[in-house]
Amino acid sequence: MKTGPALLAAIAAVILSFVTTTPAQRPQPEPANPGTFEAKVEYYLQQSGYEFHKVKANSWYLLLPGKEMSQIRIILGAGPSSIAMGAVVVPKSNLNITADSLQKLMKLSYDLNYVRICIDSDDDLIVMAQLKDQWLSAAEFKNTINIVAGAADRAYGIMRPYLTTP
């Protein structure tokens, strides 16, 4: 499934909002309108049992503990009928791509299902999954959150020896 520009822009806006504001500065977003895809996603977030935060319309994040990463920030961006879930594994400033690290990431990519490892337009190493509305159920939604978190944690473990410090 190819990511649309609007969905990528929504995810980028969510990431940027974390960098430029503190939680106290962020106004509370409006609740989703009943019957919308946004309301459906919020319902699935509530059913997941995870604490989540709405950044703006169609944009949320949640924090999960990891084994390799102390905390995994799962970022969610919804389009009209699909949702992307992702996590920044290593920001550009700490990313050191070598032939060896790339080979290890490609092998991990082969092992993973329903999630991809990629470098985004900001040159950060990320993992992400995308789901269309017709594939979504509360169970599939929560499962995808766990798959993304697990993939991010595994990718970070592989990249740890290759990290640079800013």
Feature locations, PLM:
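Bacterial N-terminal signal peptides
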Residues: 9-18
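Cleaved targeting-peptide boundary
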Residues: 19-35
